[in-house]
């Protein structure tokens, strides 16, 4: 967390994820997982930090996975495998997208192969 806040303060929010991935030596054996409602849009200056991270991942031949709420964003258009949450009601795009993302996140952190410490419940 301290690195994220320091990078944001020193370099700006737009490059915070890409700069961290660069420092972490992102390469063709890696993947990034994007959780976003809109997925980013450089032209409209929305979530450009996500766009920059995806651009870096693609330049390094890393895979890009995503779970998003809209098929019109940068993640949906440029990701290798992207789940776009279907929206029956446009007013619910954010809560439905974030709810599904939370389910996936909980499954990932609860998987026995990924647990460092067992949960109590």
Annotate each PLM feature.
Residues 1-121:
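Glycine-rich phosphate-binding loops that contact phosphosugars or nucleotide phosphates
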């Amino acid at each position: 967390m301290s690195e994220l806040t320091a990078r944001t303060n020193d370099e700006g929010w737009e490059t915070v994820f890409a700069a961290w991935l660069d420092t972490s030596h992102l390469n063709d054996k890696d993947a990034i997982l994007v959780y976003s409602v809109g997925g980013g849009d450089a032209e409209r200056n929305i979530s450009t930090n996500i766009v920059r991270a995806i651009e870096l991942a693609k330049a390094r031949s890393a895979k890009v996975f995503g779970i998003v709420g809209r098929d019109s964003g940068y993640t949906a258009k440029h990701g290798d495998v992207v789940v776009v949450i279907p929206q029956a009601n446009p007013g619910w795009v954010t809560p439905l997208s974030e709810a599904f993302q939370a389910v996936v996140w909980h499954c990932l952190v609860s998987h026995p192969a990924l647990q460092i410490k067992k949960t109590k419940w």
